[in-house]
Amino acid sequence: MRVGFTPREGLVLYNVTYQDGDEARPIFYRASLAEMTVPYGDPAPHHYRKNAFDVGEYGIGSLANSLTLGCDCLGVIHYFDGFITNSRGEVAKIENAICLHEEDFGILWKHMDWRTEQTEVRRSRRLVISFIATVGNYEYGFYWYFYQDGTIQYEVKLTGVVSTAAVMPGKVPKYGTLVAPQLNAPIHQHIFNVRMDMNIDGANNSVYEVDIVPEEDDKNPYGNAFYAKSTLLPTEQAAKRLIDPMKGRYWKIVNPSKTNAMGYPTAYKLMPGDNTLAMARPDASVSKRAAYMSQHLWVTPYHEDEKFPAGDYPNQNPGGSGLPLWTASDRTVEDTDIVVWYTFAHSHSPRAEDWPVMPVATIGFMLKPLNFFDENPANDVPPSPKNHGSKHACCA
């Protein structure tokens, strides 16, 4: 893995692999936060225009904090500095912009044999790579987590100070919440898009949508049957998709040329976390400028000039750039070098407890191996020593 940093995106990861025995197996070539839009839901003249593009307009990397040991990151830390150009065209260094460390994350796996009462437990340790940016009033923490079983997680932590405006005495705002006398915190959304140049066991991949569905009645005499239904998404238009939690929907990124010991194509599955739809109408200015918000999943063939879902220059752009423009030609995304774009949204209806500084809220997604391995790759994790002075391993 290589850790990178750009003024626009902040933290960028390259060449992420899993060391499977003697083989470093590729998972993705490049991954970053590609865009982030914050549309406000109050139609008042001084609020409806608040639609910040924190990546494309502000450059979230250039707003990265210098992280502090024991506060922003805890434990044995390795820091990376970030380098940007300032308004005079000079190179400026952001010290300790990126933090890398390991942390305990509870039980990795466990089993007790009830016959012998012998127990095996392994603790999970995850690798954390993160940075934090201050965009005006808000703070955002961006975290990549790498687990011993091959799972990859992306998480955003939202905190800071909510945007507010004064209201007349006695008015109860419809499009927000009073957080102090005559002080309204308007409702809004934080909508993120992460770009992942996939590389599952090689460059040529395909994407399938998977829904958990009941079996048809004529094949289901006892009424209990259900299965995971996979549908190939062969083109860009077919791959414009929404989440469906009622069906347990996820998407699997497959290498059709590689199989595991059971004959399944090696894959990773993209598992949505908390998510919602963008609330702005399609004819709203922000919906045109940030049209990537209309879909949770986009898939495109790799092109070196296609990096930002709202286009290269979203500032005052009337719309039509980025993913809607690229996908209009409906290129094939089957068994080729693909880029997966995942959109996830946090709807923030402020509450009194968000004032004066908001406790952290989290949102994100996971990438989990799906028949990528022949068995649990964390079986070889050694037992942990007990923490009570014993020289013996814990529960082994």
Feature locations, PLM:
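Extended effector regions of multi-domain proteins
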Residues: 1-151, 157, 161-173, 177-396
